[in-house]
Regions:
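Flexible coil/turn and secondary-structure edge motifs
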Residues: 1-182
Length: 182
């Protein structure tokens, strides 16, 4: 195994966590906060915009099974990287599109992917995703972890997360953990 880590901010971490948990090669997904100016932020502080943190997921993945470029494609295709501080009805700097990298190679690959997607005109508007060095990661409160799987009957899961998972599954069937395919 070749375990690597990356932290993504691409909207509400409940949605993002649910998507990345289904990927083959992903060893762990932890919801949390990064990119702010205060230590140990709470969900309410982040939501109020008091800390400058983004809602993020911290991933550990086996790079022998899932490449960083594949992760980047999933990242860009499962949220709107062209809206500043917004994903759908979720508005605020905590929902910004961000890649928090740990190595210079990750930075270069992220910047190259943005250039490629821009050159290919994949999106109608410019990509506004931040590519920034990882800072301190703060794990979110326990009730945010594994949210979709623990709360499938909640309306947010049914009306927001499930449609995103369905769209993801259609485009990335070959990347889904085999045991999750029905």
């Amino acid at each position: 195994m070749n375990i690597q880590k990356i932290t993504f901010g691409n909207g509400c971490f409940w949605c993002t966590e649910a998507i990345f948990q289904t990927l083959r090669g992903v060893q762990s997904v932890t919801s949390g906060y990064m990119g702010g100016r205060t230590a140990n932020p709470t969900y309410m502080e982040v939501c109020n915009g008091d800390t400058g943190h983004a809602e993020v997921i911290h991933l550990e993945y086996d790079a022998d099974e899932l490449s960083f470029d594949e992760l980047l494609l999933v990242f860009f295709k499962t949220h709107n990287p062209t809206t500043l501080n917004r994903q759908g009805n979720d508005i605020g700097t905590q929902y910004r599109s961000a890649i928090f990298y740990y190595t210079e190679e990750q930075k270069q690959k992220a910047e190259a992917m943005i250039k490629r997607l821009t050159d290919e005109k994949v999106f109608d508007s410019p990509i506004v995703t931040e590519v920034t060095p990882a800072s301190e990661f703060y794990k979110a409160e326990d009730y945010h972890q594994n949210y979709y799987n623990d709360n499938p009957d909640k309306s947010y899961c049914a009306f927001v997360i499930q449609p995103k998972l369905n769209k993801f599954a259609k485009e990335f069937t070959d990347k889904i953990r085999p045991e999750l395919l029905r």
